Regions:
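C-terminal substrate-binding subdomain of Rossmann-fold SDR/epimerase-dehydratase oxidoreductases
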Residues: 1, 46, 67-196
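Short beta-loop-alpha junction of Rossmann-like oxidoreductase domains
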Residues: 50-51
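Short secondary-structure boundary/capping segments
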Residues: 7-8, 64-65, 99
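Catalytic helix-loop patch of NAD(P)-dependent Rossmann-fold dehydrogenases
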Residues: 1-41, 55-56
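Conserved active-site helix of classical SDR/Rossmann-fold NAD(P)-dependent CH-OH oxidoreductases
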Residues: 22-29, 64, 92-93, 118
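A glycine/serine/threonine-rich, flexible loop-to-helix segment
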Residues: 54-62
Length: 196
């Protein structure tokens, strides 16, 4: 929930990422309180869709890139860690509704449909119609075991919840990547950075 303030290792390898998000929420609320500036805080969870950056180390472009190049898909750990993927159109609608509201506390905007990274890689293999295997590599330190938003406030305050199914969103995203010139496929990451 939005009331959860985190349980992170501030000196771990992903500490800067986690702490930077918490700092931005703190500074945003400080401006809101002390300067009377209207602010909104949206907590965005894993987002995907056409035109996402090809080489930012996220799971989906890495998996699709590996599949398009005929490579095995890389999963860190045993693949049991979970993520929740929100299609970009749904995210934009959620952000817009928050901006148009008068609510100034944090709101989670993401898709609560949770999937393991192993299952997600299997979905990509099935979607692409390829015969790749999944290759497992050691899990990085402090990699989140679960990432699933509670969107109760988004539903109650904004009347928002995601509409695009993961299957539909994956198909749209895959078609976008597949139709890029083949030289662009080389820009897709060789594997994802597990900490994102």
């Amino acid at each position: 929930t939005e009331e959860y303030w985190g349980n992170v290792n501030p000196v771990g390898p992903r500490g800067v990422y986690d702490e930077a998000k918490r700092f931005m929420e703190s500074i945003t609320m400080a401006y809101n309180r002390f300067h009377g500036v209207q602010t909104r805080i949206v907590r965005i969870f894993n987002t995907y869709g056409p035109r996402m950056r090809l080489n930012d180390g996220r799971a989906l472009p890495a998996f699709i890139g590996q599949a398009l190049r005929g490579e095995d898909l890389t999963v860190f750990g045993d693949g049991s860690q979970t993520r929740s993927f929100c299609f970009v159109d749904d995210l934009v609608e959620g952000i817009y509704r928050l901006l148009m509201s008068d609510y100034d506390m944090p709101v989670n905007v993401g898709n609560p449909s949770e999937i393991t990274l192993k299952e997600f890689a299997e979905e990509v293999i099935k979607l692409t119609g390829t015969a790749q295997k999944i290759v497992y590599k050691p899990l990085p330190v402090d990699d989140p075991k679960q990432r699933q938003p509670d969107i109760t406030k988004a539903k109650q305050i904004l009347g928002w919840e995601p509409k695009v199914s993961r299957a539909e969103g994956l198909k749209i995203t895959y078609d976008y990547f597949k139709n890029l010139p083949k030289e662009e496929w080389s820009k897709l990451p060789k594997e994802f950075v597990s900490m994102k």
